[in-house]
């Protein structure tokens, strides 16, 4: 049985876990005393143009200026008489002192400021509104086959405002055109409110704050395969119920329950130990093998070891079976630890080319469950595979990563 567990008893931390039986498969954590800025929208002011980087630095109201690269500037800011957009330089588009509406794409990290974009996105239950992307009619890459074909027809019937675009989310599959239009209308109204706020306020300032972790998780993860939603805080329970009522999600209202047990919620469902295990460098595999996860400034390295693995009658078969088993666990660890950036996997050497291709295919398959954008390479002659993953940015996971990195230096 798949469940969503919302642990909101602690004053400074709110945690949401998704479990299948007793196995944790996704985790969202928010520290209440730490600001969440990702996806917030600001009215900012250009403070410096850097031609050598083809980027601008934007004061959006925080201590560090944000970084706005040329590729993240929508054509709304381009000169009206421009006929060749591809050869424009940033100094021909933006000027120091100019005001702009920006959204945080990546949180600031270390000495680096936040990565900004002018391609605003407003996520709804079933679709994403892109107000600066004219004529965009996108469908989630995870939607395939007949569902994709059916949604292409529905998109053409939706009343999308001129000069705006949309992307249908996986949760939009099977929804009626009326439901999708209602969600779209709500996002459009939200965008007009944001624009109005930008008109009446002086830069730099916050003009739209992303929803809290409870609403975000319900919006992004709530699907019909979730059979129970269990909350240990009555106030959060009512917040979730109100959201479901407002979004016409009556299907889930019967599934949400208040937890009143004497044991802590996560301990009762035996996932606290799984969360604590995310601090460990070594992850054991059922067959006796293991994966070792090391964090560096440049990349994350994942090493697969056969150790005491009993899967196989010879070296080649043991290597293939251990690698195959490790791939599923690696995909799970990427989600739970929210590993982002460059990731290098060191597989156990396999001499059979067919085995290497099967491992690559298996990795692609298990990564389809990941909400983050992922790019995967091929296994090299040295047994290494390079991939990149979008960091979705849970604060506690970042703290865990920093803790591990410091421990490795000791």
UniProtKB/Swiss-Prot annotation:
User: Is Coiled coil tagged as a keyword?
Assistant: no
The GO cellular component terms are:
cytoplasm; plasma membrane
Alphabetical list of SUPFAM superfamilies matching this protein: Nucleic acid-binding proteins (SSF50249)
Entry coiled-coil feature ranges = none
Write out the annotated subcellular location. Cytoplasm; Cell inner membrane
Give the principal location in a single coarse category.
Answer: cytoplasm
What this protein needs as a cofactor is: Mg(2+)
Q: What does this protein do?
A: Endoribonuclease that plays a central role in RNA processing and decay. Required for the maturation of 5S and 16S rRNAs and the majority of tRNAs. Also involved in the degradation of most mRNAs.
Q: What is this protein called?
A: Putative ribonuclease E
Please name the gene that encodes this protein: rne
């Amino acid at each position: 049985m798949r469940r969503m567990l919302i642990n909101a008893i602690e004053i400074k931390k709110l945690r949401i876990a998704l479990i299948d039986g007793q196995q944790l498969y996704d985790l969202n954590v928010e520290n209440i005393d730490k600001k969440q800025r990702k996806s917030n929208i600001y009215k900012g002011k250009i403070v410096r143009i850097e031609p050598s980087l083809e980027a601008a630095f934007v004061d959006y109201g925080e201590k560090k200026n944000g970084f706005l690269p040329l590729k993240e500037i929508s054509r709304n800011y381009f000169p009206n008489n421009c006929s060749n957009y591809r050869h424009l330089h940033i100094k021909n588009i933006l000027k120091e002192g100019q005001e702009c509406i920006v959204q945080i794409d990546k949180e600031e990290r270390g000495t680096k400021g936040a990565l900004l974009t002018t391609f605003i996105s407003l996520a709804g239950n079933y679709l994403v509104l892109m107000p600066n992307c004219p004529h965009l009619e996108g469908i989630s890459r995870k939607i395939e086959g007949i569902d994709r074909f059916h949604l292409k027809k529905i998109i053409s019937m939706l009343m999308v405002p001129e000069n705006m675009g949309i992307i249908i989310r996986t949760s939009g599959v099977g929804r009626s055109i009326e439901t999708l239009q209602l969600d779209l209308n709500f996002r459009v109204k939200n965008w007009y409110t944001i624009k109005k706020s930008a008109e009446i306020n002086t830069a730099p300032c916050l003009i739209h704050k992303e929803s809290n972790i409870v609403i975000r998780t319900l919006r992004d993860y709530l699907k019909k395969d979730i059979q129970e939603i269990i909350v240990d805080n009555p106030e959060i329970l009512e917040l979730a119920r109100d959201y479901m009522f407002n979004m016409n999600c009556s299907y889930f209202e019967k599934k949400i329950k208040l937890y009143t047990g004497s044991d802590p919620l996560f301990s009762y469902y035996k996932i606290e130990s799984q969360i604590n295990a995310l601090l460990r460098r070594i992850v054991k595999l059922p067959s006796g093998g293991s994966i070792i996860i090391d964090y560096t400034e440049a990349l994350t390295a994942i090493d697969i070891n056969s150790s005491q693995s009993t899967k196989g009658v010879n070296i080649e078969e043991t290597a293939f079976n251990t690698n195959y088993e490790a791939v599923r666990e690696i995909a799970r660890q990427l989600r739970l630890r929210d590993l982002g950036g460059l990731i290098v996997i060191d597989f156990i050497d396999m001499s059979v080319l067919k085995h290497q291709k099967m491992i690559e295919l298996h990795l692609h398959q298990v990564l389809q469950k990941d909400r983050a954008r992922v790019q995967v390479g091929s296994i090299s002659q040295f047994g290494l595979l390079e991939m990149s993953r979008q960091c979705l940015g849970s604060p506690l996971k970042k703290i865990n990563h920093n803790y591990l990195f410091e421990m490795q230096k000791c």
